[in-house]
């Protein structure tokens, strides 16, 4: 990875600063409160005012009695209660993501440390518990614990005591009791979370004081900075240079020094084949030049023998002629070996050695 996975770091930051009790509370809040409000409360209270019937035909009396019975719709109150209790958690999550993103941006390629946000988590817990208690008190003041089947009303514009009847009172009472149970469970989970975080925060402070440095709760298992900066991975620069030198030493000076198994199916093998063809052409030219040299030597020897037979004495003439013949042959052999061009590369085949021995015997 060239860059740090920001999303993964933010998720780990939230995971390290939120306890298991906080996660359970969030599940209870979403599943047992908000979904029940939407799926169960909405069908029950959708015709609440229409089914609220009073035993009078006085205009406006039914509306006044219903307003006294239910100043606030329970469905709307429960929805507002759920959103209000989620507000501290949303604020804490936003603050955690902001701190995590800031640390990740400043850290760069170095390993970022998860910030310790136990103080902010404690403040958010206290605020959530206060909201839970306040909304529970308001819920009791508005709705109580049950829904009556009949309501008496004597306010203006009613002409006297008027009885009004509520639709589905038992079902509404059960739903109210369910939300009371959810509120109690939510408060207990918040209290357990508070008791969970206090010893943990005290232990963290003791650890920081003993070590003399601020330690995070947990760390992200990120790769070391050298891996992010060095494209060769965990190898150091010296190891990389050593490997490069070894690779340069392995490559031979001439492509033809490679064996046949290494040069097959490669461009280098084709280069070696072309080098071998050029070397065979050079061998043919060398053979032609050596044949010409042998003809010259033979012609010179024939002249020497003719001169020896016609001019000087047989004993002294033969000795001088042999010495002159040997000197001439050695001079021509040195001249032919000096004029021979070197092969561009050494052959590794087994057939080259006998060929060279044959040429050497021919020169001698």
From Swiss-Prot:
Predominant subcellular localization, coarse grouping: membrane
Membrane-spanning residues: 20-40, 77-97, 129-149, 174-194
GO biological process, one term: regulation of satellite cell activation involved in skeletal muscle regeneration
Region (Disordered): 331-364
Topology feature Cytoplasmic, residues: 1-19, 98-128, 195-364
UniProt cross-references to Gene3D superfamilies, sorted A to Z: Gap junction channel protein cysteine-rich domain
Subcellular location: Cell membrane; Cell junction, Gap junction
Keywords from the UniProt entry: Cell junction, Cell membrane, Gap junction, Membrane, Transmembrane, Transmembrane helix
PROSITE patterns, alphabetized: CONNEXINS_1, CONNEXINS_2
Top-rank taxon, per record: Eukaryota
Keyword field contains Cell cycle: no
Topology relative to the membrane: Multi-pass membrane protein
Subunit details: A connexon is composed of a hexamer of connexins.
Protein name: Gap junction delta-4 protein
Organism, scientific name: Mus musculus
UniProt lineage: Eukaryota, Metazoa, Chordata, Craniata, Vertebrata
